[in-house]
Regions:
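Alpha-helical bundle regulatory/interaction domains
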Residues: 1-47, 54-55, 59, 71-149
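Short, basic-rich loop-to-helix N-cap that marks the start of a DNA-contacting helix
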Residues: 62-64
Length: 149
């Protein structure tokens, strides 16, 4: 394969990966699995996972869980739902897995976040609150609880 053909194929693969990533962003609360996402990209599951990680720096499942945790943070800040209700609202089927991943990304359990965030972003524009409370990817959360005020 010539270099121009390889470059064109690489661009087509990136476009397919982008469409799948957009689908994850839209349908994060639906049951999604790597095999179905790979079929959407016309790739095998293994190849899709490798290419997705190369393009976006994390696995498809990791990206999906990050989207779910970001949405869960918004729901917990808004209030009105319990941690369990938020867990199921964002598409997680296991409260344990949800709590573990939430703690890895945010640095505190969802129940603690819910208690702290309830008043911390009050009066703050939502666009600012989202940036201040955005999770850190790839298990880089600080050990100490973040200051939300």
């Amino acid at each position: 394969m010539t270099s121009s053909r390889a470059a064109a194929q690489h661009l087509r693969d990136l476009a397919r990966l982008r469409r799948v990533r957009d689908r994850i962003d839209r349908e994060y609360a639906q049951p999604l699995d790597v095999e179905a996402l790979a079929r959407d990209a016309n790739m095998s599951a293994g190849h899709f996972s490798r290419e997705f990680r190369l393009a976006y720096g994390e696995s498809p499942y990791g990206y999906l869980m990050t989207r779910r945790i970001e949405r869960a943070m918004a729901l917990l800040r808004r209030g009105g739902l319990s941690v369990t209700e938020v867990c199921f609202a964002v598409g997680c089927s296991s409260l344990g897995t949800f709590s573990t991943r939430f703690t890895e990304l945010v640095g505190m359990p969802p129940s603690s976040y819910w208690r702290r965030a309830a008043g911390a972003t009050e009066g703050m524009p939502p666009c600012v609150a989202k940036q201040v409370t955005k999770p850190i990817r790839n298990r880089e959360a600080r050990v100490a609880e973040p200051q939300l005020t």
